[in-house]
């Protein structure tokens, strides 16, 4: 199935099987196995969707690996079809050939997972066992991993030496309805107290006692919860960010990958700020975005600042690999139906149309510790019947960055500029999750409504 809308329907039965398996394992008291099964389910939609697209990896090594995988997989599929249609006299020979082909493919995938785990996630569902995940966490960090079932919400709360599961009876349809109302009211700056209380009661309150001792919490959402601004949830008598710094990841496997890439990279101290690219229409100008980019020099005096007609897609694609911190203040375009065409809008020129799409980002080679996407809805991706969110964030992680700061909705220009200023200022001596928390508190002291400060979130690892 090549068309994504049809493909999501095709995956519905697969995902319902994952759901039933998670529920069955939980009912049997096998919370650890249920978690690991949930983790496997997160990558399935991403892999199947990419199977319908031609992604061009950034390095020749990656291209060669994908070509090798495709050749080995095609051999398995061809022999499988021949075996199914073979006469009895031919079946034994074909069965042996098929067994050899499957063995070769399996050995290749095992090697690819060891050498290049992120690339392997394009062709096989990665597995992240609990013990390996816990080794990544320090004493002040916990994870909350969600799985939305049709009639309950599951949350695993994981620390370096702790593992608990919380099950809350609430229908998925109710979560979807309340979250939709909440986001509409939020973006209109309306009263959100009722929806805020309901969502916090489902998402945070049941796990509150299990977060004791943590200074930061990693959120791994599921399905529609990717669209939830967790920094605006309630904890006790205040917001969760009054006590805890937050970071996000689409899956536990992505956290492992960002840690591994951080170790492998030679860190660059160079900073690039891109602001208000010339998109050919005055109506698309973002004056505060240009100021925002220029003010990066307040925190990083040697930063390269590129704005207006100079901020072309061609220039960015050619030079982005040189920088350790990259800040892009521009429009973002979220394509719900074709997520690989979601884009950061840059200036067009004679070589490129200016749309730095998800598809194109997969082909870049980036060595940045941090990419900040100060644009409209850059953090959103398509959440289908599978879960692994396909958006700009995942593409930038694959291309090489460890952390992405991005937005869930159209964020107010002035409030964003203030938040970004404090975020970079707070990075000195703090991890980035804490730097963002402090920046959100600063903005909240001036602009009380969560629409001003809860839209930006940090995805990847927290360091």
Predicted features and spans:
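A domain-level signal for caspase-like cysteine endopeptidase catalytic cores
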Residues: 93-96, 100, 223-225, 260-333, ...
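Catalytic cores of nucleophile-dependent amide-cleaving enzymes
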Residues: 252-255, 264, 324-422, 426
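An often Trp-containing, charged/polar helix-loop segment at the C-terminal end
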Residues: 414-463
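Residue-level detector of buried hydrophobic side-chain packing
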Residues: 41, 144, 155, 217-219, ...
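Flexible loop/turn segments at secondary-structure boundaries
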Residues: 151-153, 164, 225-228, 254-255, ...
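Amphipathic alpha-helical protein-protein interaction segments
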Residues: 1-239, 263-278
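Boundary/activation segment at the start of structured domains
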Residues: 161-164, 170, 180, 222-288, ...
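Active-site-proximal beta-strand/loop segments in catalytic clefts of secreted hydrolases
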Residues: 146-148, 220-223, 249-250, 274-278, ...
């Amino acid at each position: 199935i090549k068309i994504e809308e049809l493909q999501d329907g095709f995956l519905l039965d697969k995902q319902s099987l994952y759901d039933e398996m998670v529920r069955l394992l939980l009912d049997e008291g096998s919370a650890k196995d249920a978690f690991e099964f949930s983790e496997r389910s997160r990558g399935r939609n991403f892999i199947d969707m990419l199977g319908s697209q031609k992604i061009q990896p950034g390095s020749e090594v990656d291209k060669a690996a994908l070509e090798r995988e495709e050749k080995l997989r095609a051999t398995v599929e061809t022999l499988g079809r021949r075996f199914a249609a073979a006469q009895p006299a031919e079946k034994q020979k074909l069965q042996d050939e098929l067994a050899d082909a499957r063995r070769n493919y399996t050995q290749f995938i095992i090697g690819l997972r060891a050498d290049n785990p992120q690339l392997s996630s394009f062709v096989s569902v990665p597995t992240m066992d609990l013990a390996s995940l816990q080794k990544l966490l320090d004493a002040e960090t916990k994870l909350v991993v969600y799985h939305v079932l049709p009639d309950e919400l599951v949350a695993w709360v994981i620390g370096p030496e702790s593992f608990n599961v919380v099950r809350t009876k609430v229908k998925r349809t109710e979560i979807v309805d309340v979250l939709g109302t909440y986001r509409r009211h939020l973006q209109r700056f309306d009263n959100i107290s009722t929806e805020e209380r309901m969502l916090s009661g489902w998402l945070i309150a049941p796990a509150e006692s299990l977060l004791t001792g943590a200074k930061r919490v990693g959120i791994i959402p599921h399905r529609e919860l990717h669209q939830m601004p967790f920094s605006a949830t309630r904890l006790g008598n205040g917001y969760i960010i009054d006590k805890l710094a937050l970071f996000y990841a689409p899956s536990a496997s992505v956290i492992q990958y960002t840690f591994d890439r951080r170790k492998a990279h030679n860190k660059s101290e160079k900073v690039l700020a891109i602001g208000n690219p010339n998109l050919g229409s005055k109506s698309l100008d973002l004056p505060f975005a240009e100021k925002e980019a220029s003010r990066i020099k307040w925190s990083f005096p040697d930063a390269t600042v590129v704005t207006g007609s100079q901020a072309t897609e061609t220039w960015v694609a050619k030079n982005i690999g040189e920088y350790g911190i990259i800040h892009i203040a521009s429009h973002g375009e979220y394509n719900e139906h074709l997520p690989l065409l979601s884009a950061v809008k840059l200036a067009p020129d004679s070589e490129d149309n200016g749309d730095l799409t998800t598809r194109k980002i997969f082909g870049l080679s980036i060595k940045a510790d941090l990419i900040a996407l100060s644009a409209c809805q850059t953090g959103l991706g398509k959440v289908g019947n599978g879960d692994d969110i396909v958006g700009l964030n995942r593409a930038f992680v694959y291309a090489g960055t460890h952390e992405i700061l991005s937005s869930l909705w159209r964020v107010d220009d002035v409030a964003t500029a203030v938040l970004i200023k404090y975020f970079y200022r707070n990075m000195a001596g703090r991890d980035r999750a804490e730097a963002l928390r402090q920046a959100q508190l600063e903005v909240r002291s001036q602009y009380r409504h969560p629409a001003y400060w809860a839209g930006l979130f940090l995805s990847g690892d927290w360091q």
